[in-house]
């Protein structure tokens, strides 16, 4: 069975495959994960106001066009003292989508005067599985999902354009995962992406501490952890693992 991961980032596809394979066990051999990018599908416009809504929008956009089950995630950083910002705006907090250094610099400036014990935060991920109804037929719903939310992509002129739906939606599942921790004052580590170099998770791998100059013995940031260490505690890992029963149900 093919399942489409709603991403154009092949690195994320590899990460999601690794996480799911750990829990699917032998069932993993019966699933082929492919990216939306490899199928040349456009990115939908993320018009949701929560991580759950955006994850569902991305998965719906793939499922209603391809007739294949689709997995999508939406995640971001929630900083308590900032009223849960950056939230769904995490990737474009400084204005440019995916500009990690600018986003990190702005975040540090905004909480510069906040004492260490008040810099609590958490990464949150919503992971969605959308299963299309391939028995209903083609050209249904005109891009409108079961709850009335229209899925859009971006037209050539930059305006929103409804995604043409070839299939209705049979079922939807969405799960949440959190990774609590705190924001430090300077970046550490070379792994990961986004805010990982600034984030120290509460859960730490046994027997491992930072070896960075001036920070020896301190807890690791997400960017100092190996991919396996991070996946074991990460928000994305928790949300995707919670989807496994719904994915397994497609196979049996």
From Swiss-Prot:
Subunit structure: Homodimer.
Cofactor: Mg(2+)
Function: Pyrophosphatase that catalyzes the hydrolysis of nucleoside triphosphates to their monophosphate derivatives, with a high preference for the non-canonical purine nucleotides XTP (xanthosine triphosphate), dITP (deoxyinosine triphosphate) and ITP. Seems to function as a house-cleaning enzyme that removes non-canonical purine nucleotides from the nucleotide pool, thus preventing their incorporation into DNA/RNA and avoiding chromosomal lesions.
GO CC terms: cytosol
A molecular-function term among this protein's GO annotations: dITP diphosphatase activity
Keyword match Chloroplast: no
Residue numbers spanned by region Disordered: 202-229
Classification via CDD domains: HAM1
Binding positions for substrate per the UniProt entry: 7-12, 75, 193-196, 230, 235-236
Binding of Mg(2+), residues: 74
GO biological process terms held by the UniProt record: nucleotide metabolic process; purine nucleoside triphosphate catabolic process
Catalytic center residues: 74
Textual note on the cofactor: Binds 1 Mg(2+) ion per subunit.
Full protein name: dITP/XTP pyrophosphatase
Enzyme Commission designation: 3.6.1.66
Family, similarity comment: Belongs to the HAM1 NTPase family.
Catalytic activity: XTP + H2O = XMP + diphosphate + H(+); dITP + H2O = dIMP + diphosphate + H(+); ITP + H2O = IMP + diphosphate + H(+)
Keywords annotated in UniProt: Hydrolase, Magnesium, Metal-binding, Nucleotide metabolism, Nucleotide-binding
UniProt source species: Bifidobacterium longum (strain NCC 2705)
InterPro entries xref list: dITP/XTP_pyrophosphatase (IPR020922), ITPase-like_fam (IPR029001), RdgB/HAM1 (IPR002637)
């Amino acid at each position: 069975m093919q399942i489409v991961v709603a991403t154009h980032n092949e690195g994320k596809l590899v990460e999601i495959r690794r996480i799911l394979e750990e829990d699917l066990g032998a069932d993993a051999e019966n699933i082929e994960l492919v990216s939306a990018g490899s199928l040349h599908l456009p990115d939908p416009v993320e018009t949701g106001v929560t991580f759950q809504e955006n994850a569902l929008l991305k998965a719906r956009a793939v499922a209603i066009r391809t007739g294949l089950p689709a997995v999508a995630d939406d995640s971001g950083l929630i900083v308590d003292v900032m009223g849960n910002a950056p939230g769904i705006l995490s990737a474009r907090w400084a204005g440019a989508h995916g500009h990690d250094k600018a986003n990190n610099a702005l975040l540090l400036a905004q909480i510069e005067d906040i004492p260490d014990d008040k810099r609590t935060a958490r990464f949150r991920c919503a992971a969605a599985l959308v299963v299309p109804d391939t028995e209903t037929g083609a050209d249904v719903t005109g891009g409108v999902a079961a709850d009335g939310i229209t899925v859009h992509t971006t037209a050539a002129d930059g305006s929103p354009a409804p995604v043409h739906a070839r299939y209705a939606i049979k079922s939807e599942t969405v799960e949440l995962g959190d990774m609590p921790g705190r924001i430090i004052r300077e970046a550490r580590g070379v792994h990961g992406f986004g805010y990982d170099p600034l984030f120290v998770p509460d859960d730490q791998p046994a027997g491992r501490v930072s070896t960075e100059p001036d920070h020896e013995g301190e807890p690791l940031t997400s960017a100092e952890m190996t991919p396996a260490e991070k996946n074991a505690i990460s928000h994305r890992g928790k949300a995707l693992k919670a989807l496994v029963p719904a994915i397994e149900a497609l196979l049996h």
